[in-house]
Amino acid sequence: MACMKLGSKSDAFQRQGQAWFCTTGLPSDIVVEVGEMSFHLHKFPLLSRSGVMERRIAEASKEGDDKCLIEISDLPGGDKTFELVAKFCYGVKLELTASNVVYLRCAAEHLEMTEEHGEGNLISQTETFFNQVVLKSWKDSIKALHSCDEVLEYADELNITKKCIESLAMRASTDPNLFGWPVVEHGGPMQSPGGSVLWNGISTGARPKHTSSDWWYEDASMLSFPLFKRLITVMESRGIREDIIAGSLTYYTRKHLPGLKRRRGGPESSGRFSTPLGSGNVLSEEEQKNLLEEIQELLRMQKGLVPTKFFVDMLRIAKILKASPDCIANLEKRIGMQLDQAALEDLVMPSFSHTMETLYDVDSVQRILDHFLGTDQIMPGGVGSPCSSVDDGNLIGSPQSITPMTAVAKLIDGYLAEVAPDVNLKLPKFQALAASIPEYARLLDDGLYRAIDIYLKHHPWLAETERENLCRLLDCQKLSLEACTHAAQNERLPLRIIVQVLFFEQLQLRTSVAGCFLVSDNLDGGSRQLRSGGYVGGPNEGGGGGGGWATAVRENQVLKVGMDSMRMRVCELEKECSNMRQEIEKLGKTTKGGGSASNGVGSKTWENVSKKLGFGFKLKSHQMCSAQEGSVSKSNNENVKIEKLKDVKERRGKHKKASSISSER
């Protein structure tokens, strides 16, 4: 730290308790009281340097007191600063530094220590040191600005605060790698390929290491928030990038709000400052609340500028500190703008409501999701734009537009599964949150099915109608085979949903089996061609006839094993469907009076139930699969007949050839 030495005399001041004495051999003729400290000094050194002291001593002398008493209660810097002022008046050695120059400059102005009362007076000395030394250094400017807090009114009047902020903003807006600072100021290491170093202030080839854009975060976080806010405002006016400004705001917030330090070393930490250092002054709850609200207003409303985790932490602290409703609403809106970048742990927030109706703050998550959906509809080319649609269960649209909504759908499904065990969570809240996600956003409904199953498990008292209404959110066509298998055996699901699941699972299996038959038939035809015609192709094509034949045989065997397992599964499902059909027929008989109904009535009841469940196309699909299987078997029989005819023709040809040879003999 730079300094400037003043005076040449040895220190003649001694402290005894709450009093300072000047041991020059002459008795003291004036007592100056500054706060709780008293200074026993001499009149001449003081009045020869200060206009205020000259007037006060003259007024005291008129009263005829031999030893006058002067009280100074509003001196900038207090008794510590007056000690340095007194030493300057006596010509005692002292050092001007970046830490005390602001106090001395303000005190000199207050005491009117101008050039009229002595050449090289304290005002000119401090002004020269401040302008020519302090403002030329980042570190010294930070220390000087930090000291302005206690004398802010005087510092503003003398433009000291403004000069410090302008100097800091200028250096922060300039690429530090162009000039070698602030690495040199911070004592950073040097790169020297040839082993050269800095010698006598002259660079001999050494280069400072590359400095990241966040090098000033820690120094700026030492300032009080009013000064920090003024510094950030000037930096923005100088064109510093918004992401750098946002990074400094998040760093400052994490340092001064203890509740935000629970996640250390997260992805939001960057550069050489992995975690903010602790602050010596702990803010009160009211000060923390005010700081949080101020920071929230300073941050730009721009997606991706600040990590979502930071906003989630701020929202949690805002609810603990009971911040204003506007602050909480803005934080929820910010999270909603970039909800696709959030993690599941970010949304699992405890409820801080006085009523404590639920364990988790589901209402806040609902509002966040609504903000995301609303922002998505407004933004051009968003995931909710008309260009994204669903056609026959397949998503149509660019991957860039589908990805955010799909990620949010997966996130909300995970959140629903997380909060489902809460017995206090009402069905309307759970159902409303699940229904907020558009249908096209879920590629599979497995996550939603899992959440509903957990909710039904922990809410066994729900009525059958409530269960059916909740399960209507499921699209059975979007369930995977594993989910269908689990749902078919799930006793918590309504009967209507189980029938739908079994039907669609059977339909999927029939389609898969039919496809396997077609593939197997094609492979059988190819293998027969290989057996009849041998390997056709050049020496460089493929890997030989034997390798191709073996591969085809292996694939055919694998497909046959798969078809066998599918046939068994289809048979099991058909048995289950027939059993359920009988049960439904019995239900239909009982509703009609309990009489014995004919098979026609039972089948008619089943058809009615199928229509209600949306199974109108079942027969058509079944006929299609049966026709497909019939065509496959028919083609197989025709192939067998053709092979037999070929064998008969070959035998006849061989017999004719043998008979002709014998006749010639």
Swiss-Prot record:
What domain of life does the UniProt record list for this protein's source?
Eukaryota
Chain ranges of the NPH3 domain: 214-508
Sites of the modification Phosphotyrosine?
Answer: 449
Q: Where is the composition biased (Basic and acidic residues)?
A: 640-650
Q: To which pathway does this protein belong?
A: Protein modification; protein ubiquitination
SUPFAM superfamilies (UniProt xref): POZ domain
What are the coiled-coil residue ranges? 281-306
Name the residue ranges with Polar residues bias.
Answer: 271-280, 626-639
Question: Which UniProt keywords are given for this protein, alphabetically ordered?
Answer: Coiled coil, Phosphoprotein, Ubl conjugation pathway
Q: Name one Pfam family in it.
A: BTB
Positions of the region Disordered? 260-280, 626-665
GO CC, sorted alphabetically, is: nucleus; plasma membrane
The alphabetized list of GO BP terms reads: protein ubiquitination
Q: Which InterPro entries match?
A: BTB/POZ_dom (IPR000210), NPH3/RPT2-like (IPR043454), NPH3_dom (IPR027356), SKP1/BTB/POZ_sf (IPR011333)
Q: What does this protein do?
A: May act as a substrate-specific adapter of an E3 ubiquitin-protein ligase complex (CUL3-RBX1-BTB) which mediates the ubiquitination and subsequent proteasomal degradation of target proteins.
**Domain-related comment:** The BTB/POZ domain mediates the interaction with some component of ubiquitin ligase complexes.
The protein depicted here goes by the name: BTB/POZ domain-containing protein At1g30440
Species this chain originates from: Arabidopsis thaliana (Mouse-ear cress)
